[in-house]
Amino acid sequence: MRKDQFVLLSQNKMIGLFLGDTDFSEIVLSKIKKQKIKYFIIDFSKNNKFNKDKNSFRISIGRFGTIIDLIKQKKCKRVLFAGKISKPKFSSLRLDFKGIYYMPSIIKAAKIGDAAIIKSIIKILNNERIKVISSIFFNPELSLKKGCYTKLKPNKQDLISIKKGKFFFNKTKSLDHIHALV
């Protein structure tokens, strides 16, 4: 257990979970339950996946005021995003006052890409003094350190191919999502 996880556990703080679809959100939730950390869920899944949990709340993405009020009511200082949160149709969103205030920056970010939307939401939460934790904070075993994890070492042609991939990766925008480079 890392030091910052121990501090979070020892202070017995509440953590807010913005959970969407995919198995990753369930993995994060089970890990938090095992560590007996107080939590609440803001459910963004399509089919209300977490409605059986007593700490689950289904709130529309456009209701920033309600979300922020809930976070402050639970005395939560940290939130975590996990799972796939589908992009909403901005024309059909029901907005509250804070939603109306923050929506122009989110729509502007939506024109850039999905990662820009997440960054703008993180910026909004930072303005409200709410810290966003990395999604692998409780599951560090899901990420690997830098290095070669096979017995086979890359040959000269592989190294050239890797160099080309890095070149094309560096040419793309920082907010683009690239799933694979061949």
Regions found by a protein language model. Name each.
Residues 91-111:
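A charged helix-plus-loop insertion that forms the helical arch/lid used to bind
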Residues 43-62:
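N-terminal beta-loop-helix "entrance" segment that forms/cooperates
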Residues 17-19, 41-43, 79-82, 132-136, ...:
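General beta-strand structural signal in soluble alpha/beta enzymes
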Residues 9-42:
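N-terminal basic/disordered segments at the start of proteins
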Residues 57-71, 111-115:
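Glycine-rich anion/phosphate-binding loops
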Residues 84-87:
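Short glycine-rich anion-binding loops that position phosphate/pyrophosphate groups of nucleotides
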Residues 121-134, 143-182:
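Internal active-site segments that recognize and position negatively charged phosphoryl groups
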